[in-house]
């Protein structure tokens, strides 16, 4: 009697090709991201693992990296927004690389790929749990993300391996083939070679070891449909999570409160001659859509005014809890203020002016009773971002520090802090201009360190006397002869006394100033210059109302603002 060996012992176990293994892994990672985002949209948008990791990068990144990010530019995006897109895309690229590696190592052992899914998922869970706004329910999204990734990885890997094995699960094929050959040998001896119970090569339409049950083999089309379903589901889940996360109808909330933002202490009307827009300067009031935006928020916190509340606590005699209605019921102020970002380079455009409506922050602090020794007003935003403001500055009677609810006659735009933000004239935004305000604590500098202070920036950051050249622009070619130069200057709380310009290092020439609106706003300047043909360099400098001349010493933005004379090069023909 001859011996028939099982054919499975003659063949190597099926193995995924590298492209198939990578595709399986990438789709599984996409499913994990999508499901995590979807569940976060239902439970709490900040608990999306993808966003939480990005937030953690912002939270723990060194100052140099943050400044590099803010300096990035992308077509169609203003400065201060390209860094957010770049970070999110960068995290996506890193995830893609990890997914590719996980796919390749899973060719030998599928469980190794799943372990990578778990490790990445646990990293996302850690990012969620270390968020300053963490709540226990936030763990649901990262756990769902891990579960979805594991399921998708195992399911797709099994299907791809089945196809590689000829359409039937590898284990079943090997077991069935063995029994079929042995049964065929026994059948040869007993009934002429037919075995009704163990189909072999003669009956490929039935599953190996199927016990008489028929099944269709897996085809490439089946696998592609399964992969497409996972991919489309991942994208759909991600989009769904985004839409659910934006579920707060901010526009409806803004429309509801708009009629009530009516200042009882209005600012003066802007006088004629307050700008030289005809000569190339900005308009005096910056439209809301053009107002500069610099912040760390990857996803803007959205909250309806009816749901907003804030606590003033810490080193105070009486803790205050305020709703949006409480603010509206207080005397409303209206102040025109020029705001400046500390990241503004010499000659930069991170400066804007608006009419802000709100309540006196000083009055609230006096009502709470700030205790002696409280040196810092520590403010926190809805997304956990923190700012430290010198308490003595906020309490100055003439400073007009405000909790702002309106901007240029409208409710605050969402991207500029709706429902409530802080504005303290004369201080750079990083120590004063908390958006999406959620909490105020009177404390000391030793007790609390804000986001920027931990990165080596200054506690005290009054805005420096600076100027900018708006016309001509860098690289312009103008007609030789009488050339109009124009620009802006600012020294908030001190005001601008004069601006001078010089051509090619020559004598300083005084410029004509626009009408002053108040000491907290910029002033425009314009001057006629006699410019011969050739290449030229133009510089400007300002003097504030205290007589302090703008410094020529060059300084970077860190730790308390850039300085130096603005300079542009142009040609005349």
What are these regions (language model features)?
Residues 21-32, 91, 95, 119-122, ...:
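Hydrophobic alpha-helical membrane-embedded or membrane-associated segments
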Residues 209-231:
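N-terminal secretory signal peptides and thylakoid transit peptides that target proteins
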């Amino acid at each position: 009697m001859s011996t028939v060996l099982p054919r499975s012992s003659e063949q190597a176990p099926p193995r995924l090709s590298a492209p198939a293994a990578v595709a399986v892994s990438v789709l599984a990672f996409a499913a994990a991201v999508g499901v995590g985002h979807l569940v976060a949209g239902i439970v709490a948008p900040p608990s999306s693992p993808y966003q939480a990791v990005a937030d953690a990068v912002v939270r723990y990144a060194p100052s140099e990296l943050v400044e590099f990010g803010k300096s990035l530019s992308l077509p169609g995006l203003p400065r201060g927004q390209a860094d957010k897109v770049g970070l999110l895309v960068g995290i996506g690229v890193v995830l893609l690389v990890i997914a590719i590696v996980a796919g390749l190592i899973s060719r030998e052992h599928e469980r190794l790929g799943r372990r990578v899914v778990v490790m990445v998922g646990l990293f996302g869970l850690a990012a969620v749990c270390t968020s300053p706004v963490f709540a226990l329910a936030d763990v649901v999204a990262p756990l769902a993300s891990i579960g979805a990734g594991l399921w998708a990885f195992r399911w797709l890997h099994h299907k791809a391996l089945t196809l590689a094995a000829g359409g039937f699960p590898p284990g079943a094929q090997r077991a069935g083939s063995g029994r079929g050959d042995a049964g065929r040998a026994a059948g040869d001896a007993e009934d002429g070679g037919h075995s009704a119970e163990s189909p072999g090569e003669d009956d490929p339409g039935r599953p190996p070891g199927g016990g008489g049950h028929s099944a269709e083999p897996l085809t490439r089309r089946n696998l592609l449909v399964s992969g497409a379903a996972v991919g489309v589901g991942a994208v759909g889940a991600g989009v769904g999570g985004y839409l659910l996360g934006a579920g707060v109808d901010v526009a409806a909330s803004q429309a509801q409160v708009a009629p009530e933002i009516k200042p009882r202490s209005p600012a003066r009307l802007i006088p004629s001659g307050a700008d030289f827009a005809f000569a190339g300067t900005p308009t005096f009031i910056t439209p809301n859509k053009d107002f500069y935006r610099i912040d760390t928020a990857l996803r803007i916190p959205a909250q309806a005014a009816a749901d907003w509340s804030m606590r003033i606590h810490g080193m105070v005699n009486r803790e205050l809890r305020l709703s949006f209605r409480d603010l509206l019921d207080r005397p409303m102020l209206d102040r025109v203020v020029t705001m400046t970002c500390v990241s503004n380079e010499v000659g930069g455009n991170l400066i804007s002016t608006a009419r802000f409506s709100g309540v006196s922050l000083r009055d609230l602090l006096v009502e709470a009773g700030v205790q002696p020794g409280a040196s810092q007003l520590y403010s926190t935003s809805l997304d956990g971002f923190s700012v430290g403001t010198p308490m003595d500055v906020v309490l100055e009677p003439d400073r007009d520090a405000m909790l702002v609810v309106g901007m240029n006659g409208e409710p605050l735009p969402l991207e500029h802090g709706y429902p409530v933000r802080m504005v303290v004239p004369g201080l750079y935004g990083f120590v004063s201009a908390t958006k999406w305000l959620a909490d105020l604590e009177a404390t000391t500098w030793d007790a609390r360190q804000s986001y920027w202070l931990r990165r080596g920036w200054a506690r005290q950051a009054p805005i420096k006397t600076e100027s900018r050249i708006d016309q001509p622009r860098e690289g312009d070619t103008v007609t030789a002869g009488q050339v109009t130069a124009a620009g802006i200057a600012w020294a908030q709380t001190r005001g601008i006394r004069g601006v001078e310009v010089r051509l090619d290092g020559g004598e300083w020439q005084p410029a004509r100033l626009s009408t002053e609106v108040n000491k907290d706003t910029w002033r425009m300047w314009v001057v006629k210059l006699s410019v011969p043909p050739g290449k030229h360099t133009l510089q400007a400098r300002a003097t504030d109302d205290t007589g302090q001349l703008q410094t020529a010493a060059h300084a970077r933005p860190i730790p308390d603002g850039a300085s130096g004379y603005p300079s542009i090069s142009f040609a005349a023909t």
